[in-house]
Amino acid sequence: MPFYVLKLGGSLIGSANALMSALLNLSREDYCFLVIPGGGPMADLVRGLYDKGLLSDEAAHWMAILAMEQYAYLLADGTGAVLTTEISRSDGVKVLLPYRALQEDDTGMEHSWDYTSDSVAVLIASRLNSNLIKATDVDGIIIEGEVRKVVSATLLKGIRTCLDQGSIRLLKDRTC
């Protein structure tokens, strides 16, 4: 059965139910997904507090991870998707609650805004030796105003895009 780690960006919060429904339909055809939620507007609130100097890097990191958990509950709510705290390959559609797993082992991740939910998804896909799909409201990666479908992680290093710098460091020489 094909298995994918799917990072579902917070920018898609308005389409969450339709997207989860589509994933559940695909799971009936033996596709399996571990959905990694973005932080969405909840993480934006954390970033706003951080930008005002009200939070340390450490507190902001863990609060942003908890924001991902809030989005996970929204994604699973009424859709039939199952919430999980386990980082593992499994059948169907599971939505990860990442806090506990990352508290146990977040090796490779700095506690800074360079490492967001994108980095969490890359880290988990690497641990599971899985393909990673990053779903956002942008169809590709925007570099200097141009949408590119495929780029190397090396090209992205140091460029501000819709992919965080931590992900780029974790990807190293892979193609994304």
Write out the residue ranges for each language-model feature.
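Ordered, amphipathic secondary-structure segments that act as subunit-interaction surfaces
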Residues: I65-R89
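Active-site phosphate/oxyanion-binding loops
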Residues: D51-K52, E86, D91-I124, N129-C176
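Short, active-site-adjacent cap segments at secondary-structure transitions
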Residues: L12-G14, P41-D44, L102-Q103, D139-I142
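Short beta-strand segments at enzyme active-site cores
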Residues: L34-L45, I133-D137
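Short beta-strand segments
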Residues: K7-G9, I36-P37, L97-P98, A135
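A charged helix-plus-loop insertion that forms the helical arch/lid used to bind
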Residues: R47-A67
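N-terminal glycine-/serine-/threonine-rich phosphate-binding loop
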Residues: M1-L34
